[in-house]
Amino acid sequence: MKQIVKKLVESLPVVSDYYAYHWLFPRRVNAFRGLYSSFDEALKAVPSQTLTGYNHAELHDAPVRLNCTQADMETLNPIDYPVLVWLHKAFEDSSIVCDLGGNTGNSYYAFRRYIPYPENVQWTICDLPEAVKSGEAMRQRTHCPGLSFTTDLATVENAEIFLTCGTIQYMNASLPDFLGHLKNRPRHLIVQRVAFYEGEEYFTLQNIYGVYVPYKIMNDANFVASLAALGYELVDRWSIDRPCVIPFHPDRFVKGQ
């Protein structure tokens, strides 16, 4: 009976949206709701009793809390295979990496099973304090040459490779604006797991394990053009089958990331 009711609800657009907005969103990880014109507006829409932002230990300390081994950390997410291709190529002439939002070192550990790192690699993860704290704890327990952690965005100034996997959509500032203010820009940019579509940029809210965070959906063409204006050339792109569905706003649907 429950399945019949569920199918009926999902088949009626308005009812389905109401169900997704009020019932599914608080209960489902990575669910979305709301349409906002700015980061601050989205932030104000978070209920007062709900955690917001990404700087919470429970979002970053799983590897330490679960006593993960080095082998556990080296598990590759299949959606990151395209990153391996271009990081390997970037390592031909570069060895200094700034991994923005690299959490506890997920990419550093996973990628090295598949591609050789330069002997002089410097891989700096720039993230929030709680992520850095957990990352440092893991670093003490593993063999990880060249890996370091920081909360200082100035690290990007020295980077030759700028890597970010699923982070810039949580930032208020745009990546092109941020890079545009640097005196020394990275030679290579690798941007992964970011939601783009053809419409006007907007913010929504995402549920991440009970924490509500503003989430930016960017205009594809504008993003590419802004980076091109800084001298960067788009050499490849790929899509991940992870849609963003915003209840009551079918025109803001994002097919993949």
Residue ranges and their predicted role:
Residues 1-46:
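Membrane-proximal basic amphipathic "stem/tether" segments
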